[in-house]
UniProtKB/Swiss-Prot annotation:
Induction: By H(2)O(2) and abiotic stresses. The active site is at residues 17, 109. Plants overexpressing UGT74E2 develop more compact rosette structure with shorter petioles, dark-green leaves and a shoot branching phenotype after inflorescence emergence. Mature plants are shorter than wild-type. Over-expression of UGT74E2 increases plant tolerance to osmotic stress. It comes from Arabidopsis thaliana. This is UDP-glycosyltransferase 74E2. It catalyses: (indol-3-yl)butanoate + UDP-alpha-D-glucose = 4-(indol-3-yl)butanoyl-beta-D-glucose + UDP.
Length: 453
């Protein structure tokens, strides 16, 4: 490999973006590339090496002073992040050149398209990384091109559009930023602007795999130089070729982990409902009470991740009342939980990272989406990949306890449950094949690496 096989990687400063891009770095490092992972932080520290010696983490400031609230104004936040990155990169690139390892490209998050011009200004290639699936990006693309009119509300149920290789969609299946544009005008602009200069990028990377979006892939490849490199799940849960890649980089050795795993070890195979809604979804108190009642009345064992800031919404004396039927924790080792034989289904918000984890580990899912791309992911989870069901919400989005119970029984029992489990196992195998030697994503990663060797 030639000198200078060195890339700068710049994720958007959010865990759902940092995780897949840092996992991609591990795959690239295993192929011989050197990576500098630039992380925007409110408390930047000196650069440091990861477990893999070829990856250097380079924290930089988000542009806010101590005591300032960074997310009070999204436009202000994005502007300061952009300024901080543009002020930092010249010296970083120059230092790399002086060290004898000049960068060849910048791999940047799709929500920061201005980095393409920054890369080209330094004579570097620009590779955009989409942390969302093509099924979502395609919708944003049609909005960007003006070929799709944004509906005024998400609560309509008439068919609105059919995009290339898509099932028919209703407003309730679209990303929330489209149907509630007046509530999220700044975010809508950001997600649509992901496509603003995609026709000029050198390579387009996506955290998905070919078989998962096979029909849609033909369409996007006719437009752009696309390489699917997912799923970006740690290797030891998939192909097992990278023995050190066991987690996303967080310590798993604490009392809460032991509590989770010991509790699961005491349960029969496929008997536990696992619930987690990610790090951002906030349930209203009435929805939390209804969900708690549905779980209790289902009679099923359940492991529920409830953030410490949300526990006050649980019913009074709930933990005592459920006894051994349920375990409520503030955090869980999600990959270990999903891989555990006792898990019968995953009740999820259908964020893309969680959806990919469920698919990769062969776990049937119950989708309870809230915002962003979650409704679209849930639509495909149920109707295209057929690995679960989506709860039926009322007009205002509220989900009744009876619907929670019905969905759990549908996935855990009966003929439909068996078919769902069979499909989940199929996608698990296909995900493993994609990242294994000679698989579609492995070939894509090799092709990407060869551009800089």
């Amino acid at each position: 490999m030639r000198e200078g096989s060195h890339l700068i990687v710049l994720p958007f400063p959010g865990q759902g973006h940092i995780t897949p891009m840092s996992q991609f770095c591990k795959r690239l490092a295993s192929k011989g590339l050197k990576l500098t992972l630039v992380l925007v932080s409110d408390k930047p520290s000196p650069p440091y090496k990861t477990e893999h010696d070829s990856i250097t983490v380079f924290p930089i400031s988000n542009g806010f002073q101590e005591g300032e609230e960074p997310l009070q104004d999204l436009d202000d936040y994005m502007e300061r992040v952009e300024t901080s990155i543009k002020n930092t990169l010249p010296k970083l690139v120059e230092d790399m050149k002086l060290s004898g390892n000049p960068p060849r490209a910048i791999v940047y998050d799709s929500t920061m398209p201005w980095l393409l011009d920054v890369a080209h200004s330094y004579g570097l290639s620009g590779a955009v990384f989409f942390t969302q699936p093509w099924l979502v990006t395609a919708i944003y693309y049609h909005v960007f091109k003006g070929s799709f009119s944004v509906p005024s509300t998400k609560y309509g149920h008439s068919t609105l559009a059919s995009f290339p290789s898509f099932p028919m969609l209703t407003a309730n299946d679209l990303p929330s930023f489209l149907c509630e544009s007046s509530s999220y005008p700044n975010i809508l602009r950001i997600v649509v602007d992901q496509l603003s200069n995609i026709d000029r990028v050198d390579i387009v990377l996506c955290n998905t795999f070919d078989k998962l979006e096979e029909k849609l892939l033909k369409w996007v490849q006719s437009l752009w130089p696309v390489l699917n490199i997912g799923p970006t799940v740690p290797s030891m849960y998939l192909d097992k070729r990278l023995s050190e890649d066991k987690n996303y980089g967080f310590s798993l050795f604490n009392a809460k982990v032991a509590e989770c795993m010991e509790w699961l070890n005491s349960k029969e195979p496929n008997s536990v409902v696992y619930l987690s809604f990610g790090s951002l979804v906030i349930l209203k108190e009435d929805q939390m009470l209804e969900l708690a009642a549905g779980l209790k009345q289902s009679g099923r064992f359940f492991l529920w991740v409830v953030r410490e800031t949300e526990t006050h919404k649980l019913p009074r004396n709930y933990v005592e009342e459920i006894g051994e039927k349920g375990l409520i924790v503030s955090w869980s080792p999600q990959l270990d939980v999903l891989a555990h034989k006792s898990i019968g289904c995953f009740l999820t918000h259908c964020g893309w990272n969680s959806t990919l984890e469920g698919l990769s580990l062969g776990v049937p899912m119950i989708g309870m989406p809230h915002w962003t791309d979650q409704p679209t992911n849930a639509k495909f989870m149920q109707d295209v990949w057929k690995v679960g069901v989506r709860v039926k919400a009322e007009g205002d989005g509220f989900v009744r306890r009876e619907e929670i119970m019905r969905s759990v029984e549908e996935v855990m029992e009966g003929e439909k449950g068996k078919e769902i489990r069979k499909n989940a196992e199929k996608w698990k195998v296909l995900a493993q094949e994609a990242v294994s030697e000679g698989g579609s994503s492995d070939k894509s990663i090799n092709e990407f690496v060869s551009m800089f060797c």
